[in-house]
Amino acid sequence: MFVAALNIFGYTMREFVVDGGICLVAVGVGVVANVIGYQIMRRAAGDASIPKLADGLVAGLVGLLCFLLGLTLNDARENYIRAIQSATEEALQCRLMYQDFSVLAKLNDGEKSAKAQSLAVEYVQNVIDHEWPQLGESTPRLNEKAGILLTQMRLALNPTGGTFLSTRTWTGLGIVEHLRESRLRFAMEQSPSGFWIIIATLLAMSCALMGSVAPTKMRLVLIATFCLGIGIVCLLIDEYEKPYGGWIAIDAQSIFLPSEMSEAIAPK
């Protein structure tokens, strides 16, 4: 029942375990660092300046930590929004090509244009069924067949024929190819592992400096709550950096399937 409830929100058990692990690691790092920090700092209990100095350093480190996370979250969200805009533009170009191929099939060279129209439908279906899931993998990649379909559509066109539609469709194919490469770039724009090591180090240092006072149960609960909040921000960054996978992934079907093309794709 729990797994079914997760699926309702587009959340798999694997994603739940990974995201939960991020939060648990953040809490564990903070609590352990606080206990260790107390063991170290109590040796200087006779120096009254230590707690004041520690409080000042904590404020600075927490401020730096929040600044880095806020900056990264903003960049990740902007990348996510650009991925949506790119997919929307690609879907628009696919719809225009589909419509233009339909008109060209009635005007001249009907067999080739009709073939190109069916290739456009096959390309959209391939993007939804194969390329989108591949972009959501740990190592994002484009689907080879989708590239072949675009090449076949080019071969079916005659851009020197003099018609406005054939020229526009040829240009549209170039735009689709460019946007398709952009999708791969959006999928690969992720924070390096070194960044997360720095974040974990700053979190541990902040919590260790909070150890100037004995770690009572209530203090540990408060520190764990703070670390949990940091962990939630980290997993939100992680989700935004995966625009084609995860529980906030862009829905390819809703973007790429307008009514006139959805009718051409047989339901599975």
Describe each PLM feature range.
Residues 67-88, 241-244:
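Transmembrane signal-anchor/signal-peptide helices with a preference for the extracytoplasmic
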Residues 1-12:
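Hydrophobic alpha-helical segments
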Residues 78-79, 161, 225:
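Residue-level detector of alpha-helix boundaries and kinks
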Residues 10-44, 53, 184-268:
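Alpha-helical transmembrane anchor segments
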Residues 82-84, 89, 95-186:
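Structured inter-helical modules in multipass membrane proteins
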Residues 32, 61, 65-68, 72, ...:
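Residues within alpha-helical transmembrane segments of multi-pass membrane proteins, especially transporters
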Residues 21, 58-65, 225:
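Alpha-helical transmembrane segments of integral membrane proteins
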